[in-house]
Amino acid sequence: MASFMRSLFSDHSRYVESFRRFLNNSTEHQCMQEFMDKKLPGIIARIGETKAEIKILSIGGGAGEIDLQILSKVQAQYPGICINNEVVEPNAEQIVKYKELVAKTSNMENIKFAWHKETSSEYQKRVVEEDEEPPKWDFIHMIQMLYYVKDIPATLKFFHGLLAANAKILIILVSGTSGWEKLWKKYGFRLPRDDLCQYVTSSDLAQILDDLGIKYECYDLLSTMDITDCFIDGNENGDLLWDFLTETCNFIKTAPLDLKEEIMKDLQEPEFSVKKEGKVLFNNNLSFIVVEANV
């Protein structure tokens, strides 16, 4: 690995912009919307049974777009029931955006919001240190955030222990069938790493849950990321997408020529992408893992 390559996470503003470009060029949120519309109602069908209040914990809620979709489904399932929605999110900018989104969204009257600017591990530490009994939750969701957890088995075990009767955890992350799995396995050791992020897919998560003896169901949904601009020399959008794909700041400018050529060639191969109507569509398949409370 060339010493002048550095992690994308070392430049916060560039990371935020590259992530925005990823969302704009992928079907990520549409894929999540499809799951929320078709699968989520059945998953949450019993979480609020006989309860005067439904408690929801969002780990890594970001700017709240998907959180509000989830809340609308819970409201539809349990009309009039008070919902207590707590958000654990380490990024202050994202919390501001989340609050702005709530402020301009209608039908939020029966939902109480609380935001905690902290990581999931900081939340765990705070809960453990408090003398009172840890709170129980009816629904916990972790959307595209397990990559930023150092000890995934311990994290899953902890939050599984916070589930109330009939409660569920929803975890969303990239599928083991996605191009990400192949990209990380083949090139991860040649790209700059830092402690903030690790490579994990649904295949890894299934093994962890099996080892912990935790019951779960997994749903895979198709998603793509349009990386056509990545193959246009000097294209700003393409350069930012390269940064997101490789988690490398200014990948095109700083990566060794041989590495760039190899990845560029591979990402156009069928195991990574499909070519359709002149576009190169990277396999961004997502997995939705639903974890159940102990009976």
From Swiss-Prot:
One of its GO terms (biological process) is response to interleukin-1. S-adenosyl-L-methionine binds at residues 60, 89, 94, 120, 143. It is found in: Cytoplasm. It catalyses: histamine + S-adenosyl-L-methionine = N(tau)-methylhistamine + S-adenosyl-L-homocysteine + H(+). Signal peptide: none annotated. Gene3D superfamilies: Vaccinia Virus protein VP39 (3.40.50.150). Substrate binds at residues 28, 284. Inactivates histamine by N-methylation. Plays an important role in degrading histamine and in regulating the airway response to histamine. This is Histamine N-methyltransferase. It comes from Rattus norvegicus.
